[in-house]
């Protein structure tokens, strides 16, 4: 048990839920519910096509919104089964653009509009794809530096980028929002009975995201047969990316293992009542061992 760093609250106002979104489940479901009720989450931008840079021929799609001169570029990375059109991506891009920041919403390999341009698919440790996207940009776009924000699994991808690739770019700061820093613990949590509906929703969307990937016969069979996220990771994600098993994948790509060595100022936000990602994985971190990290564990949100 570690905690510390001022009770993990930093110097931020307390979270106050707005009616009727009380509790972790309603706060998790809010944007999905609003979309089903007809709320539109649209924010047009300039389409960017960025080469993945690994010889695969895969291309990453992004949306760019211009800001005022002299401001750093902000790159947003979506979560599991998300994309540029996810409500949190749209809302953040609109807000930051209104403040004058240029914003790029990056679709990870195989996500959203990138699906038709990629044979491979993203995973929690694929920080090199963020590096490839930045390397493919006009250098002028990075002239004032870059800040990055990753949501959920996108936060895990971002942490791996910061650990292994950030030195190549003028990264000024980073933010993660509810990143699953202990992948094995998150996998166990989502398999719990209370998360049955969430799990069914996620596994169906994950299968749909992988349906257009370049898969062999054995992988196609696995895509039909898997029933849990752990099986999905064990039979599809891990073998396709050289990890072998889900357990190895979780060990190699969990963000917690890279936190002690991060050199970029990074704010890590999480809600203690999140139904998917255990708060105990954040409480287990020795935050005082790295002054570059600022944890914010809110009671809800």
Each language-model region and where it sits:
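Conserved alpha/beta-hydrolase
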Residues: 82-85, 93-117
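Catalytic nucleophile-loop/oxyanion-hole region of alpha/beta-hydrolase
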Residues: 95, 109-147
């Amino acid at each position: 048990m570690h905690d510390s760093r001022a009770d993990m609250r930093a110097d931020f106002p307390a979270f106050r839920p707005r009616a009727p979104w009380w509790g972790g489940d309603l706060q998790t479901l809010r944007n999905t519910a609003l979309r089903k009720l007809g709320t539109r989450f649209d924010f047009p931008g300039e389409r960017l096509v960025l080469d993945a840079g690994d010889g695969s021929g895969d291309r990453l799609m992004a949306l760019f919104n211009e800001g005022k001169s002299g401001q750093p570029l902000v790159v947003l990375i979506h979560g599991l089964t998300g994309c540029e059109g996810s409500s949190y991506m749209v809302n953040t891009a609109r807000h930051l653009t209104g403040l004058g920041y240029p914003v790029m919403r990056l679709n990870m390999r195989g996500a959203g509009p990138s699906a038709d341009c990629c044979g491979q698919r993203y995973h929690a440790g694929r920080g090199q794809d963020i590096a490839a996207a930045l390397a493919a940009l006009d250098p002028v776009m990075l002239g004032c530096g870059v800040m990055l924000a990753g949501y959920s699994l996108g936060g895990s991808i971002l942490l791996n980028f910061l650990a292994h690739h950030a030195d190549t770019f003028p990264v000024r700061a980073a933010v993660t929002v509810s990143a699953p820093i202990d992948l094995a613990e998150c996998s166990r949590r989502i398999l719990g009975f209370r998360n049955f509906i969430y799990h069914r929703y996620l596994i169906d969307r994950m299968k749909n995201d992988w349906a257009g990937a370049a898969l062999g016969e054995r992988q196609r069979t696995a895509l039909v047969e898997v029933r849990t996220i752990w099986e999905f990771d064990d039979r599809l994600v891990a073998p396709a990316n050289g990890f072998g098993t889900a357990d190895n994948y979780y060990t190699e790509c969990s963000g917690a293992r890279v936190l002690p060595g991060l050199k970029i100022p990074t704010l890590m936000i999480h809600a203690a009542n999140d139904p998917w990602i255990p708060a105990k994985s954040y409480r287990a971190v020795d935050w005082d061992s790295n002054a570059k990290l600022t944890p914010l564990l809110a009671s809800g949100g």
